[in-house]
């Protein structure tokens, strides 16, 4: 670092607020000291931008053949780190104004909070961008040598140890154009003399600066800021390479969302939908967000405030010109611009997914199967409700297999004439849903039922209320009277209808079964919904469904079995056999066993059976009796 200069150096005192700030910075142990390099590179980039703008206006600039670049070099012998640029440079007065006073509101806020809250300085520095002064976290002394591209009055050197004053003098060894910052590093800042460490810092914080940044002659920021490029100029291969750079995932992304927004807020964004969900490989569900850049400089990695949790599968970046570079994380949370970016981003992503669902249903189905568990949680985004609901997907009785998906609008489009209800049933899989006794009446009536496989789906249905004049109801709450206007489309051979005497016996049998079961059930009554099953448990209309009750019991650690209505299918062969048995001997032990078995089988299907041992023992006893009778009849 040369000391050549012209006239004697002028000594200037820092203003009071700067002295306070420098004292805090130089005496604080702050772990994230590398931000000083981000600040210096950002300043250098701004200087290059200003020069380029001046050149486009035709303003004279010395050394016109100089490339626009930023160079970082080290001298291990003198423990000096140098950051230089070929930008617009500074005049004498600009040196005083820019480096002698606090120009950033971030620094002012920093001092104010330190005074008001009395926190440790090391706890606060990281929350505020203190601009150029951050260099004193690592520097014993700093020398800034600069030549303005717009002023022929010469070059100047600014020198300070950060202790309260700075010196200003003419410089005879200044660059042809631009600024050189020589930093004499503290003893504990030796990492910043290592080339690999410097490269890592640049790539993490300043990788997308629009000008070449070199470390010891090696070009470091080689990845272009693709989000700044027009979409039609970016190839799929470039998108894939950038996605890999961002996520380390070698697969191509499932989909790409490239946005350039001018209103109501200006920002650009490049977001990707991965081919795997957050749950895969044990990803931390709480670790999500898009990287926030301000003028290509990284401000916050994986910043959660930019997207709601139901879009947490997105990977990518957001870049805006409208935030100051020195904005802090704390200030970001209170910034109205961030809220506007988030609102706009959510609307754009939902619009993109809507177009995808319409143009490529199979690709959207793949998206749903991969990310639906997280994405479906957007049902509580009431601001975007009308955009979100059409994107929901479910399996259904009208589809061929478990992989099939349909929207609510698809369901409504297939509804029977006069139908104004979307019916659904919760189950762990398609086979369980298909065999659910509550679905039998809908199959008989030719009414489609949505199959819900996720616990959150019932919350979604209950929160929706209505959609396109259709209400949402569980098949468990189906009222046979409400479905009586729909003719049966599935005819089955039924036994001869019970005569008047038979119906009296049935009524008496049901009362007897209620007596046998006692307080275990609310009632035992004839069912109008069952076609194939002998019995089922039913809830009162408006009550919780079985799956919701189970969920609430788990949450409340409640192991009690709720009292339900046991419905009996009067046309089932088992019921007709019980009628014959009841007529012959109401006190027959087999009748009591069969009643208990029907009840516990229904409990088992609904997921309420706590202890299967009694059921298994009873089944074995009944099998023993049945096989004995069978052997006797066959004379074996």
UniProtKB/Swiss-Prot annotation:
Report if keyword Repeat is assigned: no
Which CDD domains does the UniProt entry name for this protein? Answer: HATPase_Hsp90-like
Region (C) location:
551-636
Task: Enumerate the UniProt keywords alphabetically.
Answer: ATP-binding, Chaperone, Cytoplasm, Nucleotide-binding, Stress response
Q: A GO molecular-function term, please? A: ATP-dependent protein folding chaperone
A Pfam family it matches: HATPase_c_3
Q: What is its main location?
A: cytoplasm
Q: Which domain of life is it from?
A: Bacteria
| Quaternary structure (record) | Homodimer.
Q: Which family does it belong to?
A: Belongs to the heat shock protein 90 family.
Protein name stated in the entry: Chaperone protein HtpG
């Amino acid at each position: 670092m040369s000391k050549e200069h012209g006239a004697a150096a002028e000594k200037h005192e820092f203003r009071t607020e700067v002295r306070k700030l420098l004292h805090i910075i130089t005496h604080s142990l702050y772990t994230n000291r590398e931000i000083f390099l981000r600040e210096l590179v950002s300043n250098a980039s701004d200087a290059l931008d200003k020069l380029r703008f001046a050149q486009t206006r035709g303003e004279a600039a010395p050394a016109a053949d100089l490339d626009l670049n930023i160079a970082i070099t080290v001298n291990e012998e003198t423990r000096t780190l140098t950051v230089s640029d070929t930008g617009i440079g500074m005049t004498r007065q600009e040196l005083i104004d820019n480096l002698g006073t606090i120009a950033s509101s971030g620094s002012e806020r920093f001092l104010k909070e330190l005074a008001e809250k009395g926190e440790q300085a090391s706890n606060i520095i990281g929350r505020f961008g203190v601009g150029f002064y951050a260099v004193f976290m690592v520097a014993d002394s700093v020398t800034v040598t600069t030549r303005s591209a717009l002023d022929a009055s010469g070059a100047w050197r600014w020198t300070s140890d950060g202790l309260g004053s700075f010196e200003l003098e003419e410089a005879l060894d200044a660059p042809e154009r631009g600024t050189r910052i020589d930093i004499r590093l503290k003893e504990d800042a030796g990492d910043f003399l290592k080339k690999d460490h410097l490269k890592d810092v640049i790539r993490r914080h300043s990788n997308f600066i629009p000008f070449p940044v070199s470390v010891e002659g090696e070009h470091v920021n080689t990845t272009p800021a693709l989000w700044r490029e027009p979409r039609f100029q970016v190839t799929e291969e470039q998108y894939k390479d950038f996605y890999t750079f961002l996520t380390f995932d070698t697969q191509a992304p499932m989909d790409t969302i490239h946005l350039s927004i001018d209103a109501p807020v200006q920002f650009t964004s490049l977001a990707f939908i991965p081919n795997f969900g957050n749950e895969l490989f044990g990803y931390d569900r709480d670790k999500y967000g898009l990287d926030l850049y301000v003028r290509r400089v990284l401000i916050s990695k994986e910043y959660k405030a930019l997207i709601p949790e139901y879009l947490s599968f997105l990977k990518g970046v957001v870049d805006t010109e409208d935030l100051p570079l020195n904005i802090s994380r704390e200030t970001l949370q209170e910034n109205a611009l961030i809220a506007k970016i988030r609102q706009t981003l959510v609307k754009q992503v939902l619009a993109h997914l809507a177009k995808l669902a319409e143009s490529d249903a199979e690709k959207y189905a793949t998206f749903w199967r991969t990310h639906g568990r997280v994405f479906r949680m957007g049902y509580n985004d009431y601001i975007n409700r009308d955009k979100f609901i059409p994107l929901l997907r479910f399996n259904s009785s009208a589809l061929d297999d478990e992989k099939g998906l349909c929207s609510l609008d698809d369901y409504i489009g297939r509804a029977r004439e006069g139908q104004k209800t979307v019916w659904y049933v919760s189950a762990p899989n398609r086979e369980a849903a298909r065999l659910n006794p509550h679905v039998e009446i809908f199959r008989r009536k030719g009414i489609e039922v949505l199959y819900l496989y996720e616990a959150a789906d019932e919350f979604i249905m209950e929160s929706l209320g209505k959609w396109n004049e259709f209400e949402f109801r569980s098949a468990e709450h189906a009222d046979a009277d409400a479905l009586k206007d729909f003719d049966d489309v599935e005819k089955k051979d039924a036994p001869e209808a019970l005569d008047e005497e038979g119906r009296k016996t049935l009524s008496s049998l049901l009362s007897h079964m209620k007596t046998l079961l006692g307080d275990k059930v609310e009632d035992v009554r004839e069912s109008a919904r069952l076609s194939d099953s002998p019995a089922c448990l039913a809830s009162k209309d408006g009550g919780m469904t079985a799956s919701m009750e189970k969920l609430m019991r788990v949450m409340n650690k409640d192991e009690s079995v709720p009292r339900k209505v046991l419905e009996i299918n009067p046309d089932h062969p088992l019921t007709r056999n019980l009628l014959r048995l009841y007529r012959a001997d109401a006190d027959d032990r087999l009748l009591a066993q069969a009643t208990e078995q029907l009840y516990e089988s229904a409990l088992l299907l609904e997921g309420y059976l706590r202890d299967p041992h009694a059921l298994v023992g009873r089944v074995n006893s009944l099998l023993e009796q049945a096989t004995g009778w069978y052997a006797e009849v066959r004379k074996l």
